[in-house]
Amino acid sequence: MVLSQRQRDELNRAIADYLRSNGYEEAYSTFKKEAELDVNDELDKKFAGLLEKKWTSVIRLQKKVMELESKLNEAKEEITLGGPVGQKRDPKEWIPRPPEKYALSGHRSPVTRVIFHPVFSLMVSASEDATIKVWDYEAGDFERTLKGHTDSVQDISFDQTGKLLASCSADMTIKLWDFQGFECIRTMHGHDHNVSSVAIMPNGDHIVSASRDKTMKMWEVATGYCVKTFTGHREWVRMVRPNQDGTLLASCSNDQTVRVWVVATKECKAELREHEHVVECISWAPESAHPTISEATGSENKKSGKPGPFLLSGSRDKTIKMWDISTGMCLMTLVGHDNWVRGVLFHPGGRFVVSCADDKTLRIWDYKNKRCMKTLSAHEHFVTSLDFHKASPYVVTGSVDQTVKVWECR
């Protein structure tokens, strides 16, 4: 790039000013002679400190250019993935976008679990402050607090109608709440330690729980009686989740394994052992994900014609793994989180996986290509839980920063 005569003259004067003001007298007088500079005081004032100013502004501009380039690349990616250009995107591909729609405060300790109500525009959060709070996620309003547990509430689960809510706690109990009257209708005792996970079975007749006492138990909703105990994990069972038809249970544990159980017989059908640390969370793949999973893994439909079932697991080893339960094989490992993975789910459309972790982020994975396609800085502290609404374009997250955040998807 060639400078004009005027630009060259200005640059020379700026260099001369720099040399003189920094005490390089010999270099200054040599340079002045060689550049044939006629220096007077009026001009000097104009060029005082000019070289430094130009230098710092160039660095600032470079930084800005790099920021803009990365934003441009992100925008290009969104366009190739069918990003939010106009409103042509299929809702099956909507993903959460920053910033959050609401940041809801009210809990006095870390939030441990967040879930959407299956029918109304409500969500529920559980916390180490021993309370459960109900919020309207569309309006961002606090509705009410459910009190009854005497220690940290670890997990919550709705039945499919949304009329019953189950909760479990470090106080070693499981509670069943009438979500229409917001009253506790039953308390179940039987675990010998912190109850870390609870889920109402799809048929609504039974509740399943997992505990630090290394067992899982099944309870009758009508009576509150424990009807089954599942044993096999060697350490704290972190989470338990039934599959869509309630015939299988998946569990994960501090013993670094994921296990799948047949509900009817209590037998352990699979033990999945590739994680290298505590497995924190699990999630079953919905039917909507089966085509993409088969495409991604090249697993042709088996002789029965029905693929799967498939399961996701997230671990303190910072990875997410996808499993084919029929073979016990790990189909893929998603690497990208910088800390413990605390929550993992399939996008309701089936094409993406969404996760949250102690690296304070929410991540969306294009698992067909095994890559993280979006990272959202979600909270100021560890993100402990997330839920994706099955029908409305919302994601909710909970954190050790004591807030619950609602994210809109588009």
From Swiss-Prot:
Places the protein is found: Cytoplasm, Cytoskeleton; Cytoplasm, Cytoskeleton, Microtubule organizing center, Centrosome
GO cellular component: 1-alkyl-2-acetylglycerophosphocholine esterase complex; axon cytoplasm; centrosome; cytoplasm; cytoplasmic microtubule; kinetochore; microtubule associated complex; neuron projection
Broad class of the protein's primary localization: cytoplasm
BP-aspect Gene Ontology terms: apical protein localization; brain morphogenesis; cell division; establishment of mitotic spindle orientation; germ cell development; microtubule organizing center organization; microtubule sliding; nuclear migration
Domain named LisH: residues: 7-39
PROSITE patterns named among the record's database cross-references: LISH (PS50896), WD_REPEATS_1 (PS00678), WD_REPEATS_2 (PS50082), WD_REPEATS_REGION (PS50294)
Protein keywords: Cell cycle, Cell division, Coiled coil, Cytoplasm, Cytoskeleton, Developmental protein, Differentiation, Microtubule, Mitosis, Neurogenesis, Repeat, Transport, WD repeat
Residue spans of the WD repeats: 106-147, 148-187, 190-229, 232-271, 274-333, 336-377, 379-410
UniProt keyword Coiled coil present: yes
Keyword Amino-acid biosynthesis: no
Expression (tissue specificity): Enriched in the photoreceptor cell layer.
Gene Ontology MF annotations: dynein complex binding; microtubule plus-end binding; protein heterodimerization activity
Coiled coil, from the record: 56-82
InterPro entries: Dynein_regulator_LIS1, G-protein_beta_WD-40_rep, LIS1_N, LisH, PAC1-like_LisH-like_dom, WD40/YVTN_repeat-like_dom_sf, WD40_repeat_CS, WD40_repeat_dom_sf
Function: Regulatory subunit (beta subunit) of the cytosolic type I platelet-activating factor (PAF) acetylhydrolase (PAF-AH (I)), an enzyme that catalyzes the hydrolyze of the acetyl group at the sn-2 position of PAF and its analogs and participates in the PAF inactivation. Regulates the PAF-AH (I) activity in a catalytic dimer composition-dependent manner. Positively regulates the activity of the minus-end directed microtubule motor protein dynein. May enhance dynein-mediated microtubule sliding by targeting dynein to the microtubule plus end.
Record note on quaternary structure: Can self-associate. Component of the cytosolic PAF-AH (I) heterotetrameric enzyme, which is composed of PAFAH1B1 (beta), PAFAH1B2 (alpha2) and PAFAH1B3 (alpha1) subunits. The catalytic activity of the enzyme resides in the alpha1 (PAFAH1B3) and alpha2 (PAFAH1B2) subunits, whereas the beta subunit (PAFAH1B1) has regulatory activity. Trimer formation is not essential for the catalytic activity. Interacts with dynein, dynactin, nde1 and ndel1.
Domain commentary: Dimerization mediated by the LisH domain may be required to activate dynein.
Matching HAMAP family: lis1 (MF_03141)
Family note: Belongs to the WD repeat LIS1/nudF family.
Protein name (Swiss-Prot/TrEMBL): Lissencephaly-1 homolog B
Organism listed in the record: Danio rerio (Zebrafish)
